[in-house]
Amino acid sequence: SRHSLPLSPPLFSGRIWGSSPERGDVVVFKFPPDPSLDYIKRVVGLPGDRIQMRDGELYINDQAVPRERIGQINNPDITEVSRPVDVYRETLPNGVSYETLDLSPNSVGDNTREFVVPEDHYFMMGDNRDNSTDSRFSVGFVPAENLVGRANIIFFSIAGGASPLEIWRWPTEVR
């Protein structure tokens, strides 16, 4: 199984989930249009929720999710030119908070229709809001049966301070 540690025998088939996903969980799921692909996104909508983006702000059940600008990072674009990108902290109704990136104001995903999450489905969004294939677009609602598991650790991050060649620094860069 490609979700196992190396050299471990496949002990389970299908998903392993101890409890239902909650808002703010980062989960791995099978891409609904092509279940051979695994995606990883954040759960923002639960069954029955109404989700909408208005002027770059996330609304859940007509309530704006608190969003605070906390700074900027330099982010290289596709031409490798570094440019400042705004970083925000969002706090979901259950108290889970996380950082999101806003690459540009008025991007295509900043204003959406209202999505009503069907029973046994979830609404997923990426934290890089302007550069994420998520439930606002081609991913759509994610059926519970497509969930693989919760992501609990970032093992290799391109945002980390260690180069892939600096193996000795990897343990201090795991987050």
Language-model region placement:
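Soluble "head" domains of membrane/secretory-pathway proteins
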Residues: 1-175
